[in-house]
Amino acid sequence: MLDYTEAGTILHSLMIVEHTVSNNGSFSAIRMRRMRRDEFSRRLMRENHLRVDDLIYPMFVIEGENQREAVPSMPGIERVSIDQLLIEAGQCVQLGIPAIALFPVAGEAKKSDDAAEAYNPDGLAQRAVRALKQSHPDLGVITDVALDPFTSHGQDGLIDDTGYVLNDETVDVLVKQALSHAEAGADIVAPSDMMDGRIGAIREALEAGGFIHTRILAYSAKYASLS
């Protein structure tokens, strides 16, 4: 049976042959279309293979019970209450989707200048995470670490009297938010803000809090997602 080492050697040889210069005339023998001609060679040469294992399902959660709201800018996507969230999460498990990305939609009454609701242990995101991990413990839960859902002004950070976003003060709140997610059971926290130094601060706080297995997802790895 052909092992992976031998298969890799053969594939490498194919690539070398494709880069050989032809002696028949002046036209180069580098014709990349050759390897795209047949299905078998396209399969051998393709860089990416999208499978269910590669999927993360975005879910937007709102307060209430038995609530579903369409998101006009994303046809087919809905904001759902926690009870409906659990139903959809169960469908994700049945389909083999390994993880969901959770985005809370806070009501206006929950928003403030200091975004304190972001790290409320009984906040919407935190309750949703606990419910998900209790109902579907093997489903990965990724949470969004950002303040814009919770600030009255809509900025992704704390601001001063001139509207300038305060970096270090914002990082302190982001750390509290990430810790509250980890305490609720989040497997991965994903900071989507743009504050300098927040990754190191979050990692340090997670380690100090004993959440050594909580991972941090860079949004640079998430650029092609729906969310």
Please annotate each region the language model reported.
Residues 18-62, 67:
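N-terminal amphipathic alpha-helix/helix-capping segment at the start of soluble metabolic enzymes
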Residues 66-69, 80-227:
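Alpha/beta enzyme core
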Residues 3-4, 9-19:
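Short, positively charged and aromatic/hydrophobic N-terminal segments
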Residues 1-3, 207:
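Short intrinsically disordered, low-complexity coil segments enriched in acidic
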Residues 1, 9-10, 26, 222, ...:
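Intrinsic disorder/low-structure terminal segments
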